[in-house]
Amino acid sequence: MFDVIVVGGGPTGLMLAGELRLHGVRVLVLEKETEPTRQSRAQGLHVRSIEVMAQRGLLERFLERGHTVAVGGFFAGLATSWPERLDTAHSYVLAVPQVITEQLLAEHATALGAEIRRGRALVGLRQDEDGVTVDLADGEQLRARYVVGCDGGRSTVRKLLGVAFPGEPSRVETLLGEMEMTASQEELTSVMTEVRKTQQRFGAMPLGDGVFRVVVPAEGVAEDRTASPTLDEFKQQLRAHAGTDFGVHSPRWLSRFGDATRQAERYRVDRVFLAGDAAHIHPPTGGQGLNLGIQDAFNLGWKLAAEVDGWAPEGLLDTYHAERHPVATEVLDNTRAQIQLMSTEPGPQAVRRLMAELVEFENVNRYLIEKITAISVRYDVGEGHELLGRRMRDLALKHGRLYERMHEGRGLLLDQTGRLSVAGWEDRVDHVVEVSEELDVPAVLLRPDGHVVWAGEDQQELLTRMPAWFGAATAG
C-alpha cells in the first residue's frame, strides 16, 4: 500500500512527488502516456516558481538549462518594462521549455525515491475510511492512503469524484506549434510588428536551429478539440492574418488551445485531492498555468506529508482548498481580463489603449507583474503582523541566504535575537539564529512552503502559534 498515489506525471504531479519524498512519504506517480512529451508547451517559470526551486535547491539545475530575461509584456501583451523594484531576490523570468521542467522535476523526484510508472491509465477509484482503491485500464488495482489528481484539464480523477467544474467554454481558439520557415528574420519581424498592432494572438518566436514557435488565431472552435491541427490550417490562417505563410514547413508538433475558463468547486473530497489543471483551466495568457500548478503542489505537499507522518494539526489538509482556491479564482479573473484586452473589437481596443497608458506608471506596472508572477499572494493565516500569510523572500543572511536553509522542506524559525526556542518541535522545525539587514522584525516562523505564520519576539506567543501549523509538541 502506498501512502500517496499521484495521478499525472506533468510538472504539478512531479513537483508534488518530490515534496512528498522529502518527508519519506511512499509515493507512486501514474502517468497514462508511455513517453515524456517532446512538446515545449509552457515556456518559463515566473518569480514565485523560481523561488520555489531555490527553496528546494533546484534552481541551479534550471538556470543551466534555460536563460533569464527581465522583460515586461506579460499582461495581455502590453508593452512594458520590467519593474525597477520587486520584493524578490530573483527579479527575472526563467525561460525554460516545459519538457525540460518535467525532466528536471522527474530526476529530482526519482532521486529522492519516488516511483513513476508510465503507460498506466486510471479508470476507477473508490474511497473508504482507510484509503483509496484505484483501478487501472490494464485491470491492476492499487491502494493508497491518499490520491491526488494532477491529470490535467480533462481530469479522470475529477470526473470520477463527480466534482463540478463550472466556468465558460472556449469561444475563440488559437493554433500553436513549432516548425521551420523559409522567410527571413527581417520579413518575419516586419510583418509581425504590423499584425500585432491589432491582433495579439499572433507571433513567431525563434527557438534556435531554424525552428520557430508559431501562434495564430484559428478560424473557429474545432468540434473535436483533441484533434491536432494540420500544417495546411496553419498556412491558411497565417495568410489570412499576415498575407503570407512565411514558407512554414517541417512541423515538430502542432496543437490548439481555447480560452475555456473553469475551476473545480472543491479541491478535496475526503482522501482525494485535485491540483494543477485538474483543479483549474484558463487561457495561457500571462504564462501562469504551469506556475499555478507547481505552487498548488508546493502548498499541498508538506501538508499531506504531515498527515501521513502523524503530526498534522486538525484541519491542516482543509487549508489546501481554503488557500489555493481563491488564488486560482484570481488567476482566472486576470486571464479573462487579458482575453478581453486582446480582442479586436472597438470597445476592448479602447480599453487596451487606456491600459497601455496606465502601465507606464511604475506602481501599476509593478502591481500587474506581482499578480502575474504570484509574489503578491497572501494566505489568510490570522491577524497580526503585515508579513503574516506572505511568502518570505530569499533574504541575505550574515552567513549565506535564507532559501539555502530550506532545502529539506521543514519549517523554519529565523531568530535574530538568539533568545527563542523550538523545543518540542525540533523534528519538524529548524531553528536558525541569524541576522539579516533585510528583515525588520526580531523573528519569523515560516511554514515549509516559506509563508510567514508568526512574527515577533515573545516566546510565549511563539509557543501558542506553533501547534496551529506544526501540531503538538513532542514530549521530551
Curated annotation (Swiss-Prot):
GO terms for molecular function: FAD binding; oxidoreductase activity, acting on paired donors, with incorporation or reduction of molecular oxygen, NAD(P)H as one donor, and incorporation of one atom of oxygen. It catalyses: rifampicin + NADPH + O2 = rifampicin para-naphthoquinone carboxamide + NADP(+) + H2O + H(+); rifampicin + NADH + O2 = rifampicin para-naphthoquinone carboxamide + NAD(+) + H2O + H(+); rifamycin SV + NADPH + O2 = rifamycin SV para-naphthoquinone carboxamide + NADP(+) + H2O; rifamycin SV + NADH + O2 = rifamycin SV para-naphthoquinone carboxamide + NAD(+) + H2O. Its cofactor is FAD. Belongs to the rifampicin monooxygenase family. Rifampicin binds at R196, R213. The lineage of its organism: Bacteria, Bacillati, Actinomycetota, Actinomycetes, Kitasatosporales. Keywords: FAD, Flavoprotein, Monooxygenase, Nucleotide-binding, Oxidoreductase. Its EC number is 1.14.13.211. FAD binds at T12, E31, K32, Q98, L122, T156, D277, L290, N291. It is an enzyme of class 1 (oxidoreductase). The keyword Acyltransferase does not apply. It holds the Pfam family FAD_binding_3. The gene is rox. This is Rifampicin monooxygenase. The keyword Cell membrane does not apply. PANTHER family: BINDING MONOOXYGENASE, PUTATIVE (JCVI)-RELATED, TRK SYSTEM POTASSIUM UPTAKE PROTEIN. InterPro entries: FAD-bd (IPR002938), FAD/NAD-bd_sf (IPR036188), RIFMO-like (IPR050641). Monooxygenase that can modify rifampicin, thereby inactivating its antibiotic activity. Inactivates a broad range of rifamycin antibiotics.
